[in-house]
Amino acid sequence: MTDAISPLTSKDIDTAKPITNDDAIVTQMRTFIDTLKQHNYAYYVLDNPILEDSEYDQLRRSLLELEEEYPDLVQPDSPINQVGDMPLPAFTQVTHDIPMLSLGNVFEYNDLRDFMRRVNDRLSVAQQSPEYEMELKLDGLAVSLKYVHGKFTQAVTRGDGQTGEDITQNAKTIRNMPLWLADAADIELLEVRGEVLMPKAGFERLNRLAAEKEEKTFANPRNAAAGSLRQLDPSVAASRPLAFYAYSVNQGLLDTIDTQSAALAWIKDIGFSVSAVEVVSNPREAQTYYESIIATRADLPFEIDGMVIKVNSLALQQQLGFLSREPRWATAYKFPAETVMTRLHAIDWQVGRTGQITPVGKLEPVKVGGVTVSNVTLHNFGEIQRLDVRAGDMVSVHRAGDVIPKVTRVWHEQRPENSEPVQLPSTCPVCDSPVVLPKDEALARCTGGLFCPAQQQEALIHFVSRRAMDIDGLGASWLISFFEHGLVKTVADIYQLHNHQEELVTLEKLGEKSVQNIISAIEASKHTTLSRFIYALGIRGVGETTAQNLAQQFGDLDALMSASIEKLLLTPDVGAITAELAYKFFRAPHNIEVITALREAGVHWDKVEQVVSEGLPLDGQTWVITGALDSMARDEAKAKLQALGAKVSGSISAKTTALLAGDKAGSKMAKAEKLGVKVVGEEEFLALVGE
């Protein structure tokens, strides 16, 4: 992966020798810089330092003295610039020039063959099966770096793929990330994408130091890397053992390079770290290499969670193109999910935002997929009965990728003799209100409503969440603290926190600057959309899609609040139960009072442009969309259907007019066929909407 390093040491450099001209000064600076960069790579990436700490410090001091004496000769890639800067007030949002798409996944050999077959089917019959390039799927944070005429100018996280956060100041502190590319000085704009990660040895060292200081440790290297990059104070990022590995060139690639493997070889030559690469010709060769990496995975210096397989030819990548969220020419071949056995010591009951009582299994802590798991959701009382799980049982816990761990098996033959079946609690574990399990429902519920502190807290957390009012920086821990200190009881109280700034500052670890940031974020959230506001209210049964449909259907909050059940039922995705729940919600005096207080505090939204469907081609029709579309994102397809008068629902029923099915259509396709619902392909859809 890297060439052997034979660095200079401080003994090889005469730091006391007088320097008499600019060329000699620059030569001396370059000697210091190159040696320090070699050490940084060996220390932070390979965890194999090539200098003693004292030698490193001496070289760094010598370079700093030269730079202070000759500021006009400071080199652009000097590691002196990689120690952190002033704390940032917040991260700026940046739109990617080219979206940073995610990858599809395959999990077994047959999936891999299907992926390669789909690639072949899309290519000309006359073409031979393409070569594929395989890379390690690094388990870190995806980042885009930009260089203008060789000089590093910007680093942006993936974010949602369209927009990310500007982390330039933190990225400058990554020791193996070049700040200057001499071989790219003639390239106007070079964009290199890759993964910021924390090597295993550095992660263990970081956690060991944190434990010694009785500070919080990180769960895994990925969390540590992501948390380090999102520090507002770059000096914190500078103190963390981060590394950057490049995996693509998105702008500025030389015209002479025509394959992905050649592109990675080039960016390695100009100064970037690149993971191992293998070129294969068919599924069997790919599987052989995949299995060889699994066998040696534990010996790698960093965490990986699979392989990335790409069509090697850049021209064929262009020909194959993209789905709405992922390329057709690449996929991630994930490693097998991990399943381990452990003991379930107890079952606790938690209360959710709408009163649902959820059982949580308390496990003997065990490592699954690189993460220590001590809790596992058991979903509901029906699931407990289905599994026949009891406190004291040995259970199998399964985790695949980032999926929440779950119990997949109970080892009944190892059950303790004195075990007893789990009983549904008759009263709420938080407020002692009666618990009910409605007929034909899986979830038991606390009847305490907003009298229940647990429901109050969960309602507050939901209200500020990213997809609701999106109040950045006001996390669950602070909200619970504010609640416990009596500063907020309802969501409307959040908009009165500016009146309690002195009290907020006195709370543990919350300084004036943090308080000011929270107040600013609250103020910024006042301008929202009607659909976000409806979703933020936390009406039972009203998710994001239903909130959007209600906003589109009524166009105005007052019209929605005064709507009858019959009118609510005209909204796509709103059935009898949801209509009744929404109707009762908007007539509860407490809810009316909170909504009024929110509006009086200045929460507002732009007018919703309603679609008048009468007379339009699809008036009266209900459509459902499933799978990935080639020509556009699903939200765009939804908008086009609505523009023609259709209602777009999220679920298939006998009332559905048609199902628009894209690539990888799943269970909705099977349900549509079972119910006799018409299935429309993408070409037919494009003809329908006139494209």
Swiss-Prot record:
PROSITE patterns: BRCT, DNA_LIGASE_N1, DNA_LIGASE_N2. The active site is at K137. The keyword Magnesium applies. Keywords: DNA damage, DNA repair, DNA replication, Ligase, Magnesium, Manganese, Metal-binding, NAD, Zinc. It holds the Pfam family DNA_ligase_OB. It comes from the Bacteria. Zn(2+) binds at C428, C431, C446, C452. It is an enzyme of class 6 (ligase). The keyword DNA-binding does not apply. NAD(+) binds at D53, S54, E55, Y56, D57, S102, L103, E135, R158, E195, K310, K334. One of its GO terms (biological process) is DNA repair. Its cofactor is Mg(2+); Mn(2+). Its EC number is 6.5.1.2. One of its GO terms (cellular component) is cytosol. GO terms for molecular function: DNA binding; DNA ligase (NAD+) activity; metal ion binding. SMART domains: BRCT, HhH1, LIGANc. It catalyses: NAD(+) + (deoxyribonucleotide)n-3'-hydroxyl + 5'-phospho-(deoxyribonucleotide)m = (deoxyribonucleotide)n+m + AMP + beta-nicotinamide D-nucleotide. Residues 613-691 form the BRCT domain. DNA ligase that catalyzes the formation of phosphodiester linkages between 5'-phosphoryl and 3'-hydroxyl groups in double-stranded DNA using NAD as a coenzyme and as the energy source for the reaction. It is essential for DNA replication and repair of damaged DNA. Belongs to the NAD-dependent DNA ligase family. LigA subfamily. HAMAP family: DNA_ligase_A. This is DNA ligase. It comes from Psychrobacter arcticus (strain DSM 17307 / VKM B-2377 / 273-4).
